[in-house]
A protein has these predicted regions:
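Vicinal oxygen chelate
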Residues: 2-38, 61-80, 102-146
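Amphipathic alpha-helical segments
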Residues: 44-60, 105
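A structural feature that tracks compact, well-ordered secondary-structure segments
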Residues: 92-94, 103
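Short, surface-exposed ligand-recognition loops at beta-strand->loop->(often short) alpha-helix junctions
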Residues: 40-47, 94-95
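Alpha-helical polar/charged "hotspots" used for coordination or helix-helix interfaces
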Residues: 38, 90, 97
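Short alpha-helical
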Residues: 47-48, 99-100, 121
Length: 146
């Protein structure tokens, strides 16, 4: 996983969290001190997974990555099941309308895991390539960070 930071200030850009998980600090312009830059996922067939992620709303770029909401998804060749325990539960993206994404998922035959209607958010969880769960989350008018 990569986090965008406004300045490295001499810090090592790679933080080893153990168990094969690293956070890479990417120095770039950002609206806050820390922001999501990218997520890298293993896939047995990255080309096929890329097509499936595009159907879920991710857009390809010239560098071979997929973009959504200003962050990047990198697909790397490898066995997605080659871990003792999962380190990623799901990828969440903020959307204007969960209902639109649900209708599109149903039309495309995407497997829906569940819909969660919480007091301040509405969320749709679908199964993406290599059984990675994707959450589309919509903030209701009552949503507030304070």
């Amino acid at each position: 996983m990569g986090l965008r930071v406004s300045a490295l200030d001499g810090r090592d850009p790679v933080v080893d969290l153990g168990e094969g998980l690293e956070i890479v600090l990417v120095e770039a312009e950002t609206d806050s001190e820390l922001d999501l830059d990218h997520i890298a996922l293993l896939s047995a067939d990255p080309a096929a997974a890329e097509v499936q992620w595009q159907a879920l709303g991710f857009a390809p770029d010239a560098k071979g990555r997929l973009e959504i909401g200003g962050a990047w998804l990198e697909l790397r060749q490898g066995d997605p099941d080659d871990h003792d325990r999962p380190l990623l539960n799901h990828i969440g993206v903020l959307v204007d309308s969960v209902e639109e994404h649900q209708a599109e998922a149903e039309e495309l035959g995407v497997e829906i895991d569940r819909v969660v209607d919480a007091p301040n958010t509405l969320a749709l969880f679908v199964w993406g390539p290599d059984r990675v769960k994707l959450e589309y989350v919509e903030h209701k008018p009552s949503f507030s960070l304070s």
